[in-house]
Amino acid sequence: MKATLVLFLLAQVSWAGPFEQRGLFDFMLEDEASGIIPYDPDNPLISMCPYRCQCHLRVVQCSDLGLDKVPWEFPPDTTLLDLQNNKITEIKEGAFKNLKDLHTLILVNNKISKISPEAFKPLVKLERLYLSKNHLKELPEKLPKTLQELRLHDNEITKLKKSVFNGLNRMIVIELGGNPLKNSGIENGALQGMKGLGYIRISDTNITAIPQGLPTSISELHLDGNKIAKVDAASLKGMSNLSKLGLSFNSITVVENGSLANVPHLRELHLDNNKLLRVPAGLAQHKYVQVVYLHNNNISEVGQHDFCLPSYQTRKTSYTAVSLYSNPVRYWQIHPHTFRCVFGRSTIQLGNYK
């Protein structure tokens, strides 16, 4: 009888199929046979895991499930909620009730066009909110004051209101690229309410000038792929903490005299793929600029003192990368002493004009 039982069990094992991964967390679990956590009436937190979602270590993953609305209940100790790549169209009030410990909310690549003003009210610890690739026409009202990172690129946003950002003093990163924004739709000083903001990206929009009234705390400003035609000194006034300025792929023809003096701590200047006719004034006097990208412009002449001071005194910080290739100027037309303050031959990229 025992022999028969053993043979039966062996047969059951031999009929079992190979391991098949069902979810992201399968290889993280030690006690479960799959990433699907079973219903457990004795553990209310596990039992609250939404159907077809995966819950583990305070992380709830409900991505790529074809959901058309937010599931009605989550474990209350959830810290990260992933709802990306679904078909959610609206975030209603109460959608995230009781999620007082939530730190990260991912709603990328849905069809969200409407968010209730009270939708995020329960999220008193939310730090990161990702709403990119949706159909939002305006920013949600009453954002949590605890937010540190907000990403809203590739939506349909046309206006930035000052009232939306007031009081968001913990915000560090904001991404607004890929929206049909125009300068007329950006309220003057709209972003000034974020006193600790360090990084802004407003790329691939319809803006024609650097937005006015940006927070003075910014260290990185990315405005690539817009329709900016000119950099004037006033637009950079007060930006004393700016270390990286990205203005590639615009239509800039001139950088006004005195502009670089307003950004005394600038280290990287990206002005490639524009319509510049000359090297921006003020580079030689700037103490900290290390990287200057000027390739793919219309620069036909490089002056002997455009990059270095007239004397042979060394700069406080040396250039590490200067690109001038794909400009009308020929390398043999540039005076041999033009880059006298640069150390390292590989630092300068001249190339040929095509």
Swiss-Prot record:
Membrane spanning residue stretches: none
Gene Ontology molecular functions: collagen binding; extracellular matrix binding; glycosaminoglycan binding
Lineage: Eukaryota, Metazoa, Chordata, Craniata, Vertebrata
Post-translation changes: The attached glycosaminoglycan chain can be either chondroitin sulfate or dermatan sulfate depending upon the tissue of origin.
Location in or out of the cell: Secreted, Extracellular space, Extracellular matrix; Secreted
A cellular-component GO term for this protein: extracellular space
Family in the record: Belongs to the small leucine-rich proteoglycan (SLRP) family. SLRP class I subfamily.
Gene3D superfamilies: Ribonuclease Inhibitor
Signal peptide coordinates: 1-16
Keyword Acetylation: no
A Pfam family assignment: LRRNT
Organism the protein comes from: Rattus norvegicus (Rat)
InterPro entries: Leu-rich_rpt, Leu-rich_rpt_typical-subtyp, LRR_dom_sf, LRRNT, SLRP, SLRP_I_decor/aspor/byglycan
Gene name of the record: Dcn
SMART domains referenced in this protein's UniProt entry, alphabetically: LRR_BAC, LRR_TYP, LRRNT
Glycosylation positions in this chain: S34, N206, N241, N257, N298
Keywords: Disulfide bond, Extracellular matrix, Glycoprotein, Leucine-rich repeat, Proteoglycan, Repeat, Secreted, Signal
Self-association and partners: Binds to type I and type II collagen, fibronectin and TGF-beta. Forms a ternary complex with MFAP2 and ELN. Interacts with DPT.
Superkingdom per UniProt: Eukaryota
Coiled-coil annotated spans: none
Disulfide bond positions: C49-C55, C53-C62, C308-C341
Name of the molecule in the record: Decorin
LRR repeats: 68-88, 89-112, 113-136, 137-157, 158-181, 182-207, 208-228, 229-252, 253-276, 277-299, 300-329, 330-354
Function in brief: May affect the rate of fibrils formation. May be implicated in the dilatation of the rat cervix.
Xref: PANTHER family: AGAP008170-PA, DECORIN
Annotated GO biological process: kidney development; negative regulation of angiogenesis; negative regulation of endothelial cell migration; negative regulation of vascular endothelial growth factor signaling pathway; placenta development; positive regulation of autophagy; positive regulation of macroautophagy; positive regulation of mitochondrial depolarization
Propeptide segments, given as residue ranges: 17-30
